Amino acid sequence: MKLIKIFAALCAAVVLLVGCGSQPTTTDPSAGSSGDLLDRHGLTGMSAEQVIDQLDRSTQSRPTQLGGSVRPDQLLLTDGSQEAILPLPDDKFYLAIAPFLDRSHECHFHSLGTCQGELVGEAVHVTITTVGGEALVDEEAVTWTNGFVGYWVPKGSAGTITVDQGGKQGSVSFTTGEQDATCVTTLQLV
């Protein structure tokens, strides 16, 4: 019986020591491994908006070493060994749009390192209009290496995205609530 008590005490001591030696988990991008991740990829000091804009416009072929998932309220970054979470502005919502002719992919939260649209380097005209008729975007653009174009629009808005390209056009509706899609891959040009 005494041997069992000694064994139990030793096990408890090991658990206590292991717990004391572990590093705390953090989502603060300036602390620990999160800061290291940002530093290693040249993103230190950038806002989440700046990181998204830089990674989405990257000319690297997909998939990239650094991945990012754009959520309505945060950006989740990972390189396979470390992670960082950056908060997004409370009043803005990122819409990544991949117009297509023949093929697309299912996507809800835009993946900065793996999403690949069909139309790369193509001139398009993008219009984003609210249900009230306000034009949020009305411009010529060129799709990036990943086949997307991206826009920051007001959070809580809803409306229609229209893309024109080479005499073809497509439209889809959008909403920018807490669980809405940041990745628009259903806009087929016909």
Question: Where does each model-flagged region fall?
Answer:
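Mature extracytoplasmic domains of secretory-pathway proteins
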Residues: 91-135
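Short, acidic Ser/Thr/Gly-rich low-complexity loop/linker segments typical of extracellular
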Residues: 133-146
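A short, solvent-exposed beta-strand micro-motif common in secreted/extracellular proteins
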Residues: 157-165
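Bacterial signal peptide processing site
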Residues: 21-24
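Bacterial N-terminal signal peptides that target proteins for export
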Residues: 1-10
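C-terminal motif of bacterial Sec signal peptides marking the signal peptidase cleavage site
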Residues: 16-19
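Glycine-centered loop-to-beta-strand initiation motif
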Residues: 143-151, 161
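Extracellular beta-sheet/turn segments enriched in Thr/Pro/Gly and aliphatic residues
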Residues: 84-88, 93-99, 178-190
